[in-house]
Amino acid sequence: MNSVGRRGPRRANQNGTRRRRRRTVRPVVVVQPNRAGPRRRNGRRKGRGGANPVFRPTGGTEVFVFSVDNLKANSSGAIKFGPSLSQCPALSDGILKSYHRYKITSIRVEFKSHASATTAGAIFIELDTACKQSALGSYINSFTISRTAAKVFRAEAINGKEFQESTIDQFWMLYKANGTTTDTAGQFIITMSVSLMTAK
């Protein structure tokens, strides 16, 4: 009887030990939410990184090349750099309609001569950053009609340091040839760098 009585408590103790062991296993499940936490944090970091392009203030820089053709030995006119630049539809009717602000930071003006060696005269150019002149007023910058040459103008000379609205011209380039005939002179080939900001 005594031996049977001893066996009874042992079973009870063993059952109690099993219950305690079962209880100690349950808290392991609590660890799983902690594993999910870093995933959510990492997800948020990725979200912030992916949103950066939306807030980019600039649209980068584009390079445009266009020409003004059929210049004569007595030609004159104005090239209006900005939304009025009809000679370069890719700028005036294209990219400027996609951005609120722009600035032309440099231009390279090449006069490519198509004149004969005997054609006399020169073609003069002037930059008008006020966009008001109707005729050439300065004869400092010039090209000999019978020779190909190029000139480069940086931001300081073309009002290109600050961004401005894409609805207004940045500057004009007036030109005038001093020849007395309508002989073929050549063409302007103009390369310009344009910075863009704030997409529409």
Swiss-Prot record:
Keyword Ubl conjugation: no
Disulfide bonds: none
Xref: Gene3D superfamilies: 2.60.120.20
Pfam family, one: Luteo_coat
Biased composition (Basic residues): 37-48
GO cellular component, one term: T=3 icosahedral viral capsid
Entry GO MF terms: structural molecule activity
The protein's name in its UniProt record: Major capsid protein
Compartment(s) of residence: Virion
Major location category of this protein: virion
UniProt cross-references to InterPro entries, sorted A to Z: Luteo_coat, Viral_coat
Further details from the record: The N-terminal region like those of many plant virus capsid proteins is highly basic. It has been suggested that these regions may be involved in protein-RNA interaction.
General function of this protein: Major capsid protein.
UniProt family annotation: Belongs to the luteoviruses capsid protein family.
Entry keywords, A to Z: Capsid protein, T=3 icosahedral capsid protein, Virion
Compositional bias annotation for Low complexity: 26-36
Species whose genome carries this gene: Barley yellow dwarf virus (isolate P-PAV)
Ranges for region Disordered: 1-54
